[in-house]
């Protein structure tokens, strides 16, 4: 190589560039890779610092939002704190406002709290209103503002059919109309007929109408709702019809159920040209009752029993078939019925062998089952008064005179 003028450096000689500096030569692959990793490391480190700053910022925001949330919760609790005004939701205007009716009879255009579930705001729903602004702050459960309650299992009357003397026909008719459709509905389906929807029990006072209804409540597992007709007559307009709706709503929710309305003549008398607001309100209650009885079908398993002393005063629309299909009369007991009632009531009494109940049964006075029970109770009290453990015939005689043989002059005060 020297011959052609090229001198190769020795191995120990250092290669320099044009400036005389040592020449590094091309970088290896490992060196390039380490430089890329270092750059990535720096980028990740800067990103980590940025995320740490963001984390601190988010934590501060979270603490502030939590404080605002707790403050808002306290504000909602303060708004919903009692005492609140109970009202009735009538209509929704938009998502934030609606129309409600108060217990005073006035309607208000109010604001609806944003935390309230709009699905619960249905017409006739019970709501809570703020006492100052009347804003709608809560939706109450259906049973909260209802004066109608259902008898629980331990509250049902302890009256059995065997405790009622006589009335075999009435017992059979009410069991066919009320008990059988609830327990053996397939019998009516096989025959192809519909069971009665409602039953009317009518007759003079003291003939066992309410007692027989209590026996039905005792012997059936269905829910039993008992109300008196006068309970529907309330002070404010619209309260009576709302109570009627509550009764049937409660019965449908707990079906199979039995509704027993005692003294139905308080709200179901024949309609006339009412001149006062009270009479018109009673007629509205009757119309709501008729509407509810038409509104439920046989699949709901709801039966209605009504009792009255004055069937002649009831509105014909209530008595028509389809509403009250079966009408059961409770007349004053005849001689056979008297004997059965006396035997049933005195079965647990300690009677003397000289007592002849047939003597009192044969008397021509028209007495009711309640009168016979009063006679036996008075006879027992006479024995207690004389410190005896046995009831004698004279005790029954005194009891009979005290309850049946009344001088008409004693009732002049009531004439």
UniProtKB/Swiss-Prot annotation:
UniProt-annotated location(s): Cytoplasm; Nucleus
Record PROSITE patterns: AAA
GO CC entries: cytoplasm; nucleus; proteasome complex
Binding positions (ATP): 203-210
Chief location: cytoplasm
Keywords: ATP-binding, Cytoplasm, Nucleotide-binding, Nucleus, Proteasome
Function: The 26S proteasome is involved in the ATP-dependent degradation of ubiquitinated proteins. The regulatory (or ATPase) complex confers ATP dependency and substrate specificity to the 26S complex.
Protein name (database record): 26S proteasome regulatory subunit 6B
Species for this entry: Manduca sexta (Tobacco hawkmoth)
């Amino acid at each position: 190589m020297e011959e052609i003028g090229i001198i190769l450096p020795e191995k120990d000689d250092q290669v320099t560039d044009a400036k005389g500096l040592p020449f590094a030569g091309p970088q290896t692959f490992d060196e390039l890779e380490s430089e890329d990793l270092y750059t990535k490391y720096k980028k990740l480190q800067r990103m980590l610092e940025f995320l740490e700053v963001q984390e601190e910022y988010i934590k501060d925001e979270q603490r502030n939002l939590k404080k605002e949330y707790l403050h808002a919760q306290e504000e909602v609790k303060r708004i919903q704190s009692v005492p609140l005004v109970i009202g009735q939701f009538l209509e929704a205007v938009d998502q934030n406002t609606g129309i409600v009716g108060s217990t005073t009879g006035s309607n208000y255009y109010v604001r609806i709290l944003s935390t309230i579930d709009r699905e619960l705001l249905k017409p006739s729903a019970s709501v809570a209103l703020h006492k100052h602004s009347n804003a709608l702050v809560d939706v109450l459960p259906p049973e909260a503002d209802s004066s109608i309650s259902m008898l629980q299992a331990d509250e049902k009357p302890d009256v059995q059919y065997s405790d009622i003397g006589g009335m075999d026909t009435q017992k059979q008719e009410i069991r066919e109309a009320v008990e059988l459709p609830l327990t053996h509905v397939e019998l009516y389906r096989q025959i192809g007929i519909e069971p009665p929807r409602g039953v009317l029990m009518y007759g003079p006072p003291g003939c066992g109408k309410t007692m027989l209804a209590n026996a039905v409540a005792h012997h059936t597992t269905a829910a039993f709702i008992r109300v008196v007709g006068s309970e529907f007559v309330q002070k404010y307009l619209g309260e009576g019809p709302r109570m009627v709706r509550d009764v049937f709503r409660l019965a449908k929710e707990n079906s199979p159920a039995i509704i027993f309305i005692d003294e139905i003549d308080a709200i179901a008398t024949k309609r006339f040209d009412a001149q006062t607001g009270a009479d018109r309100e009673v007629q509205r209650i009757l119309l709501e009752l008729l509407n509810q009885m038409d509104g439920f079908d046989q699949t709901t398993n709801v039966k209605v029993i009504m009792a009255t002393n004055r069937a002649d005063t009831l509105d014909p629309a209530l008595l028509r078939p389809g509403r009250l299909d079966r009408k059961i009369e409770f007349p004053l007991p005849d001689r056979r019925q008297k004997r059965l009632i006396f035997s049933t009531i005195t079965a647990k009494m300690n009677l003397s062998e000289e007592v002849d109940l047939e003597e009192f049964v044969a008397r021509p006075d028209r007495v009711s089952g309640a009168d016979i029970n009063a006679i036996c109770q008075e006879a027992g009290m006479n024995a207690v008064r004389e410190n005896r453990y046995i009831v004698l015939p004279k005790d029954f005689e005194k009891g009979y005179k005290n309850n049946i043989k009344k001088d008409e002059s004693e009732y002049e005060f009531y004439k």
